[in-house]
């Protein structure tokens, strides 16, 4: 009885990962996280005005969140880019660049 290697399941795992990511992306894109406004028949999640003979509702919709400034994400990206650039230029007494001439043998 010859020994055989176990089957390769990497493609199966890759397909499962793509399917799971697709399901999560579709779920996140179709889920509404807006607050519920109105009654069981009339929903105004984006704001609006409704009135009939017995009831009326006026809702202006969700506004921007005042606790996070609008320029903060751009500022964080800029700080990260500058930090990465500065860390690549600083000398931490470790030479990561190859200074040997093994790859440059044009004289031979």
Swiss-Prot record:
Principal subcellular localization: host cell
**Which stretches are transmembrane?**
15-31, 68-85
Q: Name one Pfam family in it.
A: Plant_vir_prot
Report one GO cellular component. membrane
Which domain of life does this protein belong to? Viruses
Where located? Host endoplasmic reticulum membrane
Q: Which residues lie toward the Cytoplasmic compartment?
A: 1-14, 86-108
Q: Which residues lie on this side of the membrane: Lumenal?
A: 32-67
Role description: Plays a role in viral cell-to-cell propagation, by facilitating genome transport to neighboring plant cells through plasmosdesmata,.
The misc remark on file is:
TGBp1, TGBp2 and TGBp3 seem to act together for cell-to-cell propagation. TGBp1 is the main movement protein that physically cross the plasmodesma with the viral genome. TGBp2 and TGBp3 would facilitate TGBp1 function.
Instruction: Quote the protein name from its UniProt record.
Output: Movement protein TGB2
Origin organism of this chain? Answer: Strawberry mild yellow edge-associated virus
